[in-house]
Amino acid sequence: MLILGIDTSCDDTSVAVLENRNILSNIVSSQIKFHSKYGGIVPEIASRKHIEWIWDVTEKALSEAKTDLKDIDLIAVCYGPGLIGSLLVGLCFAKSLSYASGKPLVGVNHIEGHIQAIFLEKSYPEYPFLCLIVSGGHTSLYRVNDFGAYKELGRTRDDAAGEAYDKVAKMLGLGYPGGPVIDALAKEGCNEKFNLPRPYLHGSLDFSFSGLKTAIKVLLKNLGYKEGNVPDEIKKDIAASFQTSVVDVLIEKIKWAISSEKLNRVVITGGVAANSELRRRAEMLKDKGINVYLPSKSLCTDNAAMIAITGYNKFLKGEISDLFLNARAYLPL
């Protein structure tokens, strides 16, 4: 079966073609250069770029997969959560293709897509397993009992981890997005230079990163530096200290979840799962007998392949969406 996957949930226009569970193409067109000067994503710009690019990206995905639209058997599309204007572009496009071709349509939850991304890899866990989704919009822990059977164990109470990265990067004058540049700078800094808080929220598997962000703001003030005007060496040390604090919390929460759920299989996914320090620390958990699974970096960030495989699995269970499917900015799993 050939599946066409479409994801326009945020600022990446992505289209993929899968043959069952095998990736034939997975095209991602990034809008970063259009948003970076604003320090974050501008929803209207994101929507307009999706409209401009969606057909070209689809043609590229089909071409790379050496197939044609008429050969596609199933169309899977992300319908939430995300930016409503962005979601509507991909959803309306997918519904139009479905209507014109008569091919079945399956709507996919973006968060479920991140969880299922690991099954695109050669190495993946048996059910049940724990899953940490950590990205710019989400930081949540789930117990995954089976496909479609998810129990939320904890979530962020304020800023998601990726959002905290972006906000700290802005304070340091590093631009947008903050994750990759902080990750790179942290390798050159001392992570013990500044003693930043670790918001563990003892007794809970929830997350909270707003206090850590505030601690950086106070630190800059105490050091006598204005936001956006910080010496390079200080930037490096703050980046290293901040990243260590975030990763410490994420790893500790995983350990707590393993203990409470009596499970030693863990998937870490989402855009922040591409972070080198988080991946390094996650690999170290294997020394403690914990089975850790990380998608390749290209499958951690937003992509349509994860939407396609999730749609495929839903289709196999007999789940099909109609043309009245609506985009949902907020969509619980």
Swiss-Prot record:
Enzyme class: transferase
Signal peptide from the UniProt entry: none
GO terms, biological process: tRNA threonylcarbamoyladenosine modification
Cofactor mode of binding and number, as noted: Binds 1 Fe(2+) ion per subunit.
Compartments where located: Cytoplasm
Keywords: Acyltransferase, Cytoplasm, Iron, Metal-binding, Transferase, tRNA processing
The EC number(s) this enzyme carries: 2.3.1.234
Positions contributing to substrate binding: I133, V134, S135, G136, G137, D166, G179, D183, N275
Residues that bind Fe cation: H110, H114, D302
Catalytic activity: L-threonylcarbamoyladenylate + adenosine(37) in tRNA = N(6)-L-threonylcarbamoyladenosine(37) in tRNA + AMP + H(+)
Classification via Gene3D superfamilies: 3.30.420.40
InterPro entries in the record: ATPase_NBD, Gcp-like_dom, KAE1/TsaD, TsaD
GO cellular component: cytoplasm
CC cofactor: Fe(2+)
GO molecular function, one term: N(6)-L-threonylcarbamoyladenine synthase activity
PANTHER family per the UniProt record, alphabetical: TRNA N6-ADENOSINE THREONYLCARBAMOYLTRANSFERASE, TRNA N6-ADENOSINE THREONYLCARBAMOYLTRANSFERASE, MITOCHONDRIAL
Family of the protein in this entry: Belongs to the KAE1 / TsaD family.
HAMAP family documented for this protein: TsaD
Reported function: Required for the formation of a threonylcarbamoyl group on adenosine at position 37 (t(6)A37) in tRNAs that read codons beginning with adenine. Is involved in the transfer of the threonylcarbamoyl moiety of threonylcarbamoyl-AMP (TC-AMP) to the N6 group of A37, together with TsaE and TsaB. TsaD likely plays a direct catalytic role in this reaction.
Protein name, as recorded: tRNA N6-adenosine threonylcarbamoyltransferase
Species this chain originates from: Thermodesulfovibrio yellowstonii (strain ATCC 51303 / DSM 11347 / YP87)
